[in-house]
Amino acid sequence: MNQVMIANLMVSLSQTEKLQEGLVRHMVLNSLLNYRSEFKKKYGEFVLCYDNRHYWRRDAFPHYKGTRKRDREKSKHNWDNIFELLNKLKAEFLEHLPYKVVEVDGAEADDIIAVLCKQQGLANIRLQNNMQPPVKTLILSGDKDFIQLKRYGYVDQYNPCLKKWVEGLDPKLYISEHILKGDRSDGIPNFLSDDSCLVEGRRQKPLRKVLIAKWSTQSPEDFCTTPELMDQYERNRKLIDFECIPKEMSEKIIDTYESLVPANRSDLSSYFEENELNDLVSAVNYF
């Protein structure tokens, strides 16, 4: 949900420099209405997944997403006000929307999505054992981190910003390359580089495409020629590969999801009326 909300918020800021709470609320809810109308029949009901402020990855790697604060400081936008609004809308959606809204201490939305996709796989095995078709899962996000989840044949991914399906990439090869290259946007260097090079603004050690192509098909023991390289490879694997989500975090996500009771759909009209979402009142039965 963070991506959906920020995308709508940035569109609103492109129209006016002032942050308009009502406009952002309306845009986000209208997006949800459109997605539900398009995808519910095939994929079932929404699960809205949110990042928690505390990340287990930052406990494991203190520089995780360490470059983002610096980038926000360079931005012309007031990110304190933006986060305040996003948190307010999240609380409203948890209270009023008739869907499971999931936030777990220590987890990112990526973790929640990955764990629930894997959990659906176990449920699908039981369905198939009973001669029933598996349940399809759709990830509504353009984030390429989710390509690795497409190794599960029942998972599809749709990029709502580009309005196109994410497909054509080998999930196994993609995750292998991703571990080697790291993720600059998350402050994760390539595996040849030390922990702090990105947050300190230093250049990473060059990693040629020909070596990525070669090593992505090999075991790390074949090319990590020193203990330091192996440690840095494992650093990246732990942060990037969803198979490395800690067991206790996975269990907490499942417990939280299963305990959630969505808000009553019959109360949705009152929420829309209170916030002057008049055109959505007439569409309330489609939420």
Segments from the language model and where they lie:
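Noncatalytic, basic helical substrate-engagement surface that gates or grips nucleic-acid strands
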Residues: 1-138, 151-164, 241, 247-248, ...
